[in-house]
Amino acid sequence: GIPCAESCVYIPCTVTALLGCSCSDKVCYN
C-alpha cells in the first residue's frame, strides 16, 4: 500500500484512518 505519513507504534492510526489507512508493520498504509 501507500504510506500515509503516520505511524501506529504506540497509538493506532487516527487522522489517516479517516482517509482509509490502516496499521501495517508500525506504519499506517492506504
Curated annotation (Swiss-Prot):
Tissue: Detected in stems (at protein level).
PTM section of the record: This is a cyclic peptide.
Superkingdom classification of source: Eukaryota
One family name in Pfam for this protein: Cyclotide
Cross-link (Cyclopeptide (Gly-Asn)): G1-N30
Disulfide bonds: C4-C21, C8-C23, C13-C28
Claim: Disulfide bond is one of the keywords in the record: yes
Keyword annotations from UniProtKB, A to Z: Disulfide bond, Knottin, Plant defense
Example of a GO biological process term: cytolysis in another organism
InterPro entries per record: Cyclotide (IPR005535), Cyclotide_bracelet_CS (IPR012323), Cyclotide_sf (IPR036146)
Described purpose of this protein according to its UniProt entry: Probably participates in a plant defense mechanism. Has cytotoxic activity against HUVEC cells (LC(50)= 2.26 uM) and various cancer cells including HeLa (LC(50)= 3.48 uM), MCF-7 and K562. Displays very weak hemolytic activity. Binds to and induces leakage in phospholipd membranes, particularly ones containing 1-palmitoyl-2-oleophosphatidylethanolamine (POPE).
Domain notes: The presence of a 'disulfide through disulfide knot' structurally defines this protein as a knottin.
Record's protein name: Cyclotide hyen-L
Organism from which the protein derives: Pigea enneasperma (Spade flower)
